Structures are given as structure tokens and as C-alpha cells.
Amino acid sequence: MSKSENLYSAARELIPGGVNSPVRAFTGVGGTPLFIEKADGAYLYDVDGKAYIDYVGSWGPMVLGHNHPAIRNAVIEAAERGLSFGAPTEMEVKMAELVTNLVPTMDMVRMVNSGTEATMSAIRLARGFTGRDKIIKFEGCYHGHADCLLVKAGSGALTLGQPNSPGVPADFAKHTLTCTYNDLTSVRAAFEQYPQEIACIIVEPVAGNMNCVPPLPEFLPGLRALCDEFGALLIIDEVMTGFRVALAGAQDYYGVVPDLTCLGKIIGGGMPVGAFGGRRDVMDALAPTGPVYQAGTLSGNPIAMAAGFACLNEVAQPGIHETLDELTTRLAEGLLEAAEEANIPLVVNHVGGMFGIFFTDAESVTCYQDVMACDVERFKRFFHLMLEEGVYLAPSAFEAGFMSVAHSMDDINNTIDAARRVFAKL
């Protein structure tokens, strides 16, 4: 047995499923998850000594690559001053100033510890600000594991939501309406059925949890218009896309102005950080200035703030996003060329430093139904053969891939060459 197999066997006796987040268990592709010993640049190194070109990037945060010296040094320096104070620090002010400068739609920002905390708190704030209970989310989008978000559509387009996890009371789920991503007609229908009850729409501007599905040109502006028409708030969940699709996020890339924005992943530079912010009048409703309660023992932790501050300063340097786009475009084009040579039907979506690989005969993938029609079994074989080639992709057909500026063009070309060999075996 490999060391990863031994560790996984031991972990399953002590940790549910052997992992601390379900997708890591390889349940989406089968087999034994790799246990990682270290990471540097564009590479992961497992406990058995094998190196992999990494396109997971810790599920998004590692836009600069692993173990970036500026972030590592900032963490070490901050740790020497203390680990946590439970009191305000100068770095929190500097971090808030930096974030609000980089994302102009955020007049104010509140730091939390995860993307789930950010979305959960933003929805509570939207409900408190509007005095309404219902929310709209989209089929195939994921916004963390808060009860009100673990909801699937009912049997009809306008039925009340149903829990998709045991432990979520139906009374919670009934306030969540699930519409079809990239379909404004379904959203208008929900508003027309509940015109005075919907507090907010929450949306991934690029859906990254049904692989990678960009918005159609009219979709995000249409959501903005519907929110304005019916008096609801628009929450854009930029936990994945923030500082990755563009410096000011996908909202800037696509030209839409939200009322609230949720951030995570890159904002922490690899440390557990989330944030939410937006319009000053909305944020003023948050405690202690307003009645909507939110708190956190480790929110604004000095080490996490130092890591995030260092990361965002690096991400803000000229050329970062152009490099991400160039590398991702080359990877997408190369994979499509290699698949065509092997007569493998393939669609590769990509935006900025995100991409998605779909085994499908369809010309495009634009919604949840398109994603579910893809050949998941072929993806599983593709994943394991690429892993044997030393390429680490997301272990699920429903998760986006992430590029970093630490990837070289040689890494990209080697990945394409590996895919060419793998396609010949599929």
C-alpha cells in the first residue's frame, strides 16, 4: 500500500469519510485521495514523493501559486507579534481600505472566517434591511453550507424549495426559491409570484460549482434590473471569482453593480478568510451600528489579515490578470485541439483564471441541465489517467479548475501533451 492509502485508512477511523471536506475524498471520481506533504509554485508533492502540476490551487486561493514568499513572510512576521487578540488591529483597517479600493462597489466591508460565513451573513443582512424573508438562488450554484442555501428546486419551477441535506428543516428551505442559471424568465416568474417577499438574489457571477459556467451576456444585467424593479438586493458571490476573473472581480468584468459582494479564497492568501460588503446604507444596518447581528471570535485575525493583505498587494500588480488569461486560454485551446485529434467531444469553458472541462456532444454548456448531461464516467477515467501523468485536476466533474501565475507555459504545454496521451486511451 502507498503512504496515501495507509493514511486514508487511518483517517477514516478518526474523521468522517477520512476528510474534513467531502470533495477531497475522491467520491466524485473513485479511488484513494492523495495526501499532500508540501506545495510550491504550481506543484503539489504527495506523501509518496510524486509531484503534480496543480490545477486545484487549494480550491481557488492560490492564484499566485503555492508558498508565495511575500505571503509566507507576512504570516511569519505577524505570528511573531501574537496569534489572536480579540481586539481591533491596524491591519484590519489597512485590509478594509485595500479591499474597498480594489472593489469600488464595496463602500464598507466586514471580515469573517470563510465564504460560508460571508454568504450567510450577507443574506441575513439583506433580509434585515428589506424586512423580507425569501431569497432566490440558482440551480447548480453553491454558496456554502448554511441551511438556507442547501436547497434544491421543488417539483415545479415556482414551488418552494426543498432541503437537499438531512438536518435542514423544511421550514427553512421554504424561503429559498431556486431558479435556472442564465434564465431570466424563471427569475421574473419568481418575483411575479412573490413580488413583496423576496429580500435578495444571490448568484455566482461565474458558476464554479457546476464546473465552470459563465453568464450569458444579458443574465447579470437582467438580475440587476429585476432587483431594482421589485425592491430586492443583488448579492454577488465572488468567493471564487473575486480578484481572479479580474482585479475588481467578475462584477467589473461583466459590468454589473451589486448591492452586496461576498469574498473568500484569494482574499485570505491561503488562510481562512471571508468578507462581505457593499452599499454603505445596507452595511450600516449591521451590528453594532444597526440591528442585524453578526459576530466572530477570530474574524479579522491578525495572521489571516497579514496573509490577505500581502496576497492582494501582489494580485494588484500590473500584468497579473493578463498572465492568468493567457495561460488559461492556451490550456483551453490546447485541450480542445488534443480532444479533436482523438475525436473526443469536449467543451472547455474559461474566464480569467478559471476553467471547466466537459465531455459532451453539445456545442456549449450554459446551465445546470447542460452540465448534468455531460459524460461523468468519461471524466472519471480522464481524471485518473491525468493523475498518472502527474496532473492534478479537481476530483469531480462538477468543480472548476484554477490557474495561477506560478504556472509556466511549459507546465501548460506539458499538461496538453499529457491530455493528448490520455485522450488516445479514452
UniProtKB/Swiss-Prot annotation:
Bilayer-crossing regions: none
PROSITE patterns in the cross-refs: AA_TRANSFER_CLASS_3 (PS00600)
Residues recorded as bearing N6-(pyridoxal phosphate)lysine in the entry: 265
GO molecular function: glutamate-1-semialdehyde 2,1-aminomutase activity; pyridoxal phosphate binding; transaminase activity
Pathway in which this enzyme or protein is active: Porphyrin-containing compound metabolism; protoporphyrin-IX biosynthesis; 5-aminolevulinate from L-glutamyl-tRNA(Glu): step 2/2
A Pfam cross-reference name: Aminotran_3
One annotated Gene Ontology cellular component of this protein: cytoplasm
GO biological process, one term: protoporphyrinogen IX biosynthetic process
SUPFAM superfamilies reported for this sequence: PLP-dependent transferases
Family annotation (Gene3D superfamilies): Aspartate Aminotransferase, domain 1, Type I PLP-dependent aspartate aminotransferase-like (Major domain)
Main location: cytoplasm
Catalytic reaction list: (S)-4-amino-5-oxopentanoate = 5-aminolevulinate
Subcellular location: Cytoplasm
Assembly and interaction partners: Homodimer.
Family, as annotated: Belongs to the class-III pyridoxal-phosphate-dependent aminotransferase family. HemL subfamily.
NCBIfam families to which the protein is assigned, alphabetical: hemL (TIGR00713), PRK00062.1 (NF000818)
Listed name of the protein: Glutamate-1-semialdehyde 2,1-aminomutase
